[in-house]
Amino acid sequence: MIYTITFNPAVDLVIQVDQCQLGELNRSKGEAYVAGGKGINASLVLQRLGHVNYATGFVGGFTGQYIKDTLIQEGVKPLFVEVDGITRVNVKVKSQEETEINAAGPQVSPEKFAELLAIFERDLSSDDVVFLAGNAAPGLDVKAYIAIAKLCQERGAKFVLDTNKQLLTECLLYRPFVIKPNHHELGEIFGVSLKDEAEIIHYAKKLQELGARHIIVSRGGEGALLLTEDGQVFSSDIPKGRVVNSVGAGDSMLAGFVATYLETGDFAQSLKRGAATGSATAYSVWIAERQLIDDLVNQIHVVAH
């Protein structure tokens, strides 16, 4: 089974305006509510690619119910722990520029985290894959990530890690199956500015030395690099298209990669479909649909180094 964990999911309120002026009344030309969070995005992509999965984490109130309802409509199985308060609402104002206001989210108590951990202590096996995605919720810290990562290692489950620099580096010891920093984030980990492909590969290998098994480094318009555990290096380009929405593109890429690897065990094919999935989300209003992913796959070229 595949599980995704989003400690601090959100409902994203996307508002379209001609021009956003601070201190003035701004009228919306249109708005939309969507379920958000890295693990949520991964769950939706996995489901659309035919992989049944459980979405876990913490939700509360009517916004938490909205997220669960959205997932159920998509075929994802919600397995959240309910907390006091309401799941946060993040506001994204789109005009000539995009402005975001992200809420803090509800507090998660040690008792509530213990409830979530108990689910995995009861059910997790070596056949499972766990996406540990996003940042910590209020009340949680790196210990929560380490607890999940350590349990995955002990049970022999693959775990996929997509989070910030501190949380990522603290969990490398537990041998994540795959991580996906972009080239800026990779440079920040080591305090350097990466100028070319050779430098990216050099520092990605250092992350492997610290424990990561496979690493995807996304490079925006220049495509992506994949370094595998057995020393292979692949690069991909990206298909042509107009970027509509950058939110969730990286999560989609990672989900597309993992879904394809589980189906084929082929790294080149996995990178190719992962790149197509990330691009399909970037070229869509929300999370990518299967048809667009399939259309874009044939436009992508993967090269072994």
What is the predicted role of each segment?
Residues 47, 153, 262:
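Gly/Ala-rich phosphate-binding loop of Rossmann-like dinucleotide-binding domains
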Residues 2, 51-53, 78, 159, ...:
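Hydrophobic anchor at the start of a short beta-strand
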Residues 1-56, 64-66:
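Glycine-rich phosphate/adenosyl-contacting loop at the front of the ribokinase-like
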Residues 48-128, 297-305:
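Conserved N-terminal subdomain of the carbohydrate kinase-like
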Residues 129-198:
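Conserved beta-alpha-beta core of the PfkB/ribokinase-like small-molecule kinase fold
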Residues 150, 169, 197-305:
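Conserved phosphate-binding/catalytic region of the ribokinase-like
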Residues 19-27, 181-183, 234-237:
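Short glycine/proline- and charge-enriched loop/turn segments
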Residues 46, 182, 250:
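Short, conserved phosphate/pyrophosphate- and ester-handling motifs at nucleotide-, phospho-/glycolipid
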